[in-house]
């Protein structure tokens, strides 16, 4: 248990979807800072690490199935550096928010989380909705802007502004978000 949890959203991705062409270059830019953030979270006694990933409509899929599909997908190089370790907390989701129809809020409350770092993809979709759901649950939100990837640069920038202004999210870097 710690005061801070890092939630990695939707990074187990096959990159075989209509938005992949626009998304891939942006994900490529965040892999190193995100991998560093994940590595620091894994080794810290003061940070909890949770992966939440879309189940892509496969309600029978285990998290390991989703990871396997991502590693077999079009861009395994964007997946390998950030694959969750065997002892990592993982869960699947069915919609944009990592909170919707998941046990995330329950888990974070059990861990006594006081601060939530949200990283992953897509900034203007799943990151935004997860941040909003965290905010309405009274979790202070931190967004490492170099560890989130968007599809549309203009919408992603607007989403970051909305999170900062409307949700009091702290916008920082992956290197600085854990202190």
Please give the residue ranges for each predicted region.
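Short beta-strand segments at enzyme active-site cores
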Residues: 47-54, 59, 144
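Active-site-adjacent betaalpha module
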Residues: 1-5, 36-46, 67-179
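N-terminal beta-strand-loop-alpha-helix module at the start
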Residues: 6, 17, 30
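A short alpha/beta connector and helix-capping loop motif
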Residues: 20-41, 45-51
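N-terminal nucleotide-binding beta1-loop-alpha1 segment
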Residues: 5-11
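Short, glycine/acidic-enriched loop or turn micro-motifs at the edges of active sites
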Residues: 13, 57, 149
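Metal-dependent catalytic neighborhoods of phosphoester/phosphodiester hydrolases
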Residues: 60-65
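Short acidic, Gly/Ser-rich segments with clustered Asp/Glu that frequently serve as metal-coordination loops
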Residues: 12-18
């Amino acid at each position: 248990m710690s005061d801070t949890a890092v939630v990695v959203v939707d990074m187990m991705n096959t990159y075989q979807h209509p938005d992949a062409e626009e998304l891939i270059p942006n994900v490529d830019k965040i892999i190193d800072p995100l991998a560093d953030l994940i590595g620091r979270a894994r080794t810290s006694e003061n940070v909890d690490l949770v992966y939440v990933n879309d189940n892509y409509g496969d309600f029978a899929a285990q998290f390991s199935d989703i990871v396997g599909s991502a590693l077999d997908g079009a861009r395994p190089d964007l997946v390998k550096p950030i694959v969750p370790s065997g002892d990592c907390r993982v869960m699947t989701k069915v919609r944009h928010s990592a909170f919707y129809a998941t046990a995330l809020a329950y888990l974070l409350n059990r861990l006594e989380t006081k601060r939530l770092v949200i990283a992953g993809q897509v900034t203007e979709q799943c990151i935004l909705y997860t941040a909003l759901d965290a905010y309405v649950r009274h979790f202070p939100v931190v967004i490492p802007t170099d560890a989130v990837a968007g599809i549309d640069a203009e919408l992603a920038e607007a989403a970051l502004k909305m999170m900062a202004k409307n949700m009091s999210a702290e916008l920082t870097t992956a290197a600085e978000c854990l202190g």
